């Protein structure tokens, strides 16, 4: 999951609160 696509990364980042 750490090497997911940029879309996935942005999704998790926003989830996080970034």
From Swiss-Prot:
An annotated Gene Ontology molecular function: lysozyme activity
Signal sequence interval, chain numbering: none
- Keyword Hydrolase set for record: yes
Specify the domain of life of the species encoding this protein: Eukaryota
Q: Which UniProt keywords apply?
A: Antimicrobial, Bacteriolytic enzyme, Glycosidase, Hydrolase
Q: How is its activity regulated?
A: By lipopolysaccharide (LPS).
Gene Ontology BP, a term: killing of cells of another organism
E.C. code? 3.2.1.17
The catalysed reaction is: Hydrolysis of (1->4)-beta-linkages between N-acetylmuramic acid and N-acetyl-D-glucosamine residues in a peptidoglycan and between N-acetyl-D-glucosamine residues in chitodextrins
Q: Which family does it belong to?
A: Belongs to the glycosyl hydrolase 22 family.
Q: What does this protein do?
A: Lysozymes have primarily a bacteriolytic function; those in tissues and body fluids are associated with the monocyte-macrophage system and enhance the activity of immunoagents.
Name the UniProt record assigns to this protein: Lysozyme
Q: What is the lineage of its organism?
A: Eukaryota, Metazoa, Ecdysozoa, Arthropoda, Hexapoda
